[in-house]
UniProtKB/Swiss-Prot annotation:
This is 5-oxoprolinase subunit A. It catalyses: 5-oxo-L-proline + ATP + 2 H2O = L-glutamate + ADP + phosphate + H(+). The keyword Transferase does not apply. Forms a complex composed of PxpA, PxpB and PxpC. It is an enzyme of class 3 (hydrolase). Its EC number is 3.5.2.9. One of its GO terms (molecular function) is ATP binding. Signal peptide: none annotated.
Length: 247
């Protein structure tokens, strides 16, 4: 049976987090630098553990004002220290509740810059490796972060997005520009199934781009996030595609 991991970015102040955790297999929990705090981290970790969901850290630039979506140009040692700090904080909370951190997925601008900026990607991966080399690195399919992780001997998962538009080079269409977000649930469902089954995605210019789909992101902060998550779980099930973190 074909299987896929479904992940969601959680602990960011949305009231659907607990319900979403019943539908996804991996949770990326905000570590306080773009959203959340120690209380939301503890609460979300507890929910995830009760649901048996794989827990990951969701570190970002220090940018609460802009939800971590503004590009920043920090030195590699600053990136290293910031990622290490955020991973360590969440890992301590997970351990205190009897669990273990499983993966790391950068957030927002940090994620996007790391997909194309090799020195930044290497700084992130060095921090992850030095903290715990068993952690899995989630990164944009085909991007520099995934390449850096594998180069340093870490396991990586190539991530695709159900509700985001793609450029012809495999990058995500920048937020705020036409085609960045897929508002139609049907279109997002079709895109997800195509990526999982056919390992390709149609870019906004109409070209088909090869893509490796190992984990699918369902954004937890969308207006219809919960309804869409239910639909995609149902659709995947009807297509004979299992959902599990180890996929």
């Amino acid at each position: 049976m074909t299987a896929i991991d479904l992940n969601a970015d959680l602990g960011e102040g949305c009231d659907t987090d607990e319900a979403l955790l019943a539908l996804v297999s991996s949770a990326n929990i905000a570590c306080g630098w773009h959203a959340g705090d120690v209380n939301t981290m503890r609460q979300t970790v507890g929910w995830a553990l009760r649901q048996g969901v794989s827990i990951g850290a969701h570190p970002s630039f220090p940018d609460r004002e802009n939800f971590g979506r503004t590009e920043m140009h920090l030195q590699p040692d600053e990136i290293y220290a910031g990622v290490l700090f955020q991973i360590g904080g969440l890992s301590a909370i997970v351990r205190a509740q009897g669990g273990k951190l499983a993966h790391v997925k950068a957030h927002g601008a940090l994620y996007n810059q790391a997909s194309r900026d090799r020195p930044l990607a290497m700084a992130i991966v060095h921090a992850i490796r030095d903290f715990d080399p068993s952690l899995v690195v989630f990164g944009l399919a085909g991007g520099e972060l995934v390449k850096a992780a594998r180069e340093l001997g870490l396991q990586a998962k190539e991530e695709v997005f159900a509700d985001r538009g793609y450029n012809a080079d495999g990058s995500l269409v920048k937020r705020g520009t036409p085609g960045a977000l897929i508002d139609s649930e049907d279109a997002a469902l079709d895109q997800t199934l195509t990526m999982v089954r056919e390992q390709r995605v149609k870019a906004i210019d109409g070209t088909w781009v090869p893509i490796r789909a190992e984990t699918v992101c369902l954004h937890g902060d969308g207006a219809h996030a919960l309804a869409f998550a239910r639909r995609i779980r149902e659709r995947l099930g009807s297509e004979g595609i299992a959902v599990r973190a180890g996929a």
